[in-house]
């Protein structure tokens, strides 16, 4: 379902398995219709890394709460149902999230405790059913964007009728043969560029689509009028 973006996602997962504790400076963002199979992928990654190292049920408010402790000891997290477009200041909220995704050291303030600095080992998937869930510009560096374009009926058919869901559920059983095979696979994926994970996130076509949707309506309207030579930009070639 992920298509050509799978290569990068595969490298991301392999990096977490082969080099636990290494901070990846960007997150994988998946948008799709509800029921797009995102939860199954999260469960598989959590099983591969060890459920005690992961939290696949995070939400935005948890992440940015003043007294949040969810990042303590966390290796992998999934931020679910993200939709910052529904919040008052999408730009400010996106910036809050960026710090958690990219900074190797975070300052937290546990309730009734003094501030402390903690190492940030956590790497993230972000899931949303809304493809305008973040505020992005062309210069954004921390999000690898994948939009799963299949309709829900198509996804359910492949998961249910073609047996993929049963295979995944079987693999989720503790110490199952399928899970061992999958872990062996990712342990042997050749990581082509370790430095990639410390650089800017690779840009995808889906990224630029989301950038376009992040622009305010007035900006899109003015650009459209400019490129189509309409008022107030019309010109007679002079």
What spans do the regions from the language model cover?
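Conserved AAA+/SF3 P-loop NTPase catalytic/coupling segment centered on the Walker-B
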Residues: 75-101, 133-140
């Amino acid at each position: 379902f992920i298509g050509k973006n799978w290569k990068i996602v595969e490298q991301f997962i392999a990096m977490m398995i082969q080099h636990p504790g290494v901070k990846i400076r960007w997150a994988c963002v998946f948008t799709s219709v509800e029921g797009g199979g995102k939860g199954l992928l999260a469960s598989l990654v959590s099983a591969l890394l060890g459920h005690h190292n992961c939290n696949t049920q995070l939400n935005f408010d948890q992440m940015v709460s003043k007294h949040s402790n969810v990042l303590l000891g966390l290796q992998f997290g999934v931020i679910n149902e993200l939709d910052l477009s529904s919040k008052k200041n999408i730009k400010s909220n996106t910036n809050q999230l960026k710090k958690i995704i990219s900074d190797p050291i975070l300052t937290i303030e546990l309730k009734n405790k003094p501030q402390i600095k903690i190492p940030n080992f956590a790497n993230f998937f972000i899931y949303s059913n809304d493809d305008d869930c973040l505020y992005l510009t062309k210069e954004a560096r921390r999000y690898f964007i994948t939009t799963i374009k299949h309709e829900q009926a198509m996804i359910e058919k492949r998961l249910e009728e073609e047996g993929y869901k049963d295979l995944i559920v079987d693999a989720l059983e503790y110490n199952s043969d399928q899970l061992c095979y999958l872990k062996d696979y990712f342990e042997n994926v050749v990581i082509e560029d370790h430095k990639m994970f410390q650089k800017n996130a690779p840009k995808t076509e889906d990224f630029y689509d989301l950038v376009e949707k992040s622009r305010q309506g007035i900006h899109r309207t003015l650009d459209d009028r400019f490129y189509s030579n309409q008022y107030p930009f019309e010109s007679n070639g002079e």
